[in-house]
Amino acid sequence: MLTITSYFGFLLVVLIITSSLFIGLSKIRLI
């Protein structure tokens, strides 16, 4: 059970990082 929760937590962190990077790149392109 602990491995499943940690796996989902890792996926959540990766998703947040990728989304933030994508938003940052789009903002730089707009500027």
Curated annotation (Swiss-Prot):
Which GO BP terms sit in this record? photosynthesis
Entries under Pfam families matching the protein: PetL
Highest taxon of source: Eukaryota
- Transmembrane stretches, start-end: 4-24
Membrane-topology descriptor: Single-pass membrane protein
For this chain, the family text in UniProt reads:
Belongs to the PetL family.
Protein name in UniProt? Cytochrome b6-f complex subunit 6
Species whose genome carries this gene = Glycine max
